[in-house]
A protein has these predicted regions:
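Short, aromatic/His-centered strand-loop micro-motif at the edge of beta-sheets
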Residues: 140-162
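Flexible glycan-contacting loops in extracellular carbohydrate-active proteins
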Residues: 184-214
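Extracellular carbohydrate-recognition regions
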Residues: 25-56
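Beta-strand-rich interaction surfaces with strong enrichment in secreted/lumenal proteins
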Residues: 81-87, 149-155, 204-205
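Short carbohydrate-recognition loop motifs
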Residues: 61-80
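Extracellular beta-strand elements of beta-rich domains used
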Residues: 97, 218-220
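Secretory/extracellular carbohydrate-interaction modules
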Residues: 77-137
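Carbohydrate-binding surfaces in secreted/extracellular proteins
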Residues: 162-190
C-alpha cells in the first residue's frame, strides 16, 4: 500500500515537472514569436535619405526626409522615392504610416509594396483620381478606380490620416483611420503594378501625383501565418 502511494506521488510529481517544462516551452515560443513581430521602422535613423533613393521620373518634385517625416514636393506628374535597404517586408505582414496632403488635387500616398514575393507588387493609392479614390492597383490588370478594392473618400488638406495595411499571400486589407476600406481575397488573382513609371517604385516605394505630401511613422512587422 505504501509503495503504491509512493509510486502515485512519483507520477504526480513527474506530471508537475512535465507540465512545468511544457509551460516554459510555451513561454519561450511566445517570446520568440513576439520578438519576430517587433515593429521595424523604415524611416532613416539619422539625417539624410538613409536607405531611400529619390526617383527620376522627369519633372518630379524634390523629396526630403527630416526627423522621420518624408516630404514629397509636387511635380509635373509622378514624384517619389524607392527603398533600397535590407528590411524589406515579407508576407504575411502589416504596415502602417500617417500621411497628409498639403497641396495638390490627387493622391498623397502611393505606397508600392511586395505582396506574395518581392517581385510581385501592388500600389495602395490614397486620394487618387481627382483626390478621393482609395484602393489597390492592380488586380487582374484593373486599377483601384476599376476593381472592387476602390472606394471614394473625402480627404482634407493638412490633416493627418493613419493608414494600415495587412498583406497576406491570399488577401489584402486596408484601413484609413479606424475604417476598414479593403478586405479582398486574392487567391487565384493576378496581382501587379500599373504599367509605366510606378514600376520604378518597386519593391517598396512612396509616391504622389501632382501633389505635395508629408508621410511619417512608416513601419512594418510580421504577422502570424
Amino acid at each position: 500500500m505504501t509503495q503504491c502511494i509512493r509510486n502515485g506521488a512519483g507520477v504526480f510529481l513527474l506530471s508537475i515537472m512535465v507540465s512545468g517544462a511544457d509551460q516554459k516551452t510555451v513561454e519561450v515560443e511566445t517570446k520568440d514569436a513576439e520578438a519576430d513581430r517587433k515593429w521595424v521602422s523604415l524611416a532613416p535613423s539619422k539625417a539624410g535619405m538613409g536607405s531611400w533613393k529619390a526617383l527620376n521620373f522627369g519633372g518630379e518634385g524634390d523629396t526630403t526626409w527630416k526627423e522621420g517625416t518624408l516630404t514629397i514636393e509636387e511635380g509635373a506628374e509622378l514624384s517619389g522615392v524607392v527603398f533600397t535597404g535590407k528590411d524589406l517586408p515579407e508576407a504575411p505582414y502589416e504596415l502602417e504610416l500617417e500621411a497628409r496632403r498639403t497641396s495638390g488635387v490627387d493622391f498623397f500616398c502611393g505606397l508600392t509594396l511586395p505582396v506574395r514575393d518581392p517581385k510581385t507588387c501592388v500600389t495602395f493609392i490614397c486620394g487618387g483620381w481627382g483626390g478621393g479614390v482609395v484602393g489597390f492597383s492592380s488586380l487582374d490588370g484593373m486599377d483601384a478606380s476599376e476593381n472592387e478594392t476602390g472606394s471614394y473618400q473625402a480627404f482634407k488638406d493638412e490633416q493627418w490620416y493613419k493608414i494600415r495595411l495587412e498583406i497576406r499571400s491570399e488577401s489584402l486589407k486596408a484601413w484609413v483611420g479606424k475604417k476598414e476600406l479593403v478586405d479582398v481575397n486574392t487567391k487565384g488573382r493576378k496581382l501587379g503594378l500599373r504599367f509605366g513609371d510606378i514600376e520604378k517604385c518597386a519593391p517598396l516605394g512612396l509616391s504622389t501625383w501632382q501633389t505635395t505630401a508629408e508621410l511619417r511613422g512608416l513601419r512594418w512587422r510580421k504577422l502570424p501565418e
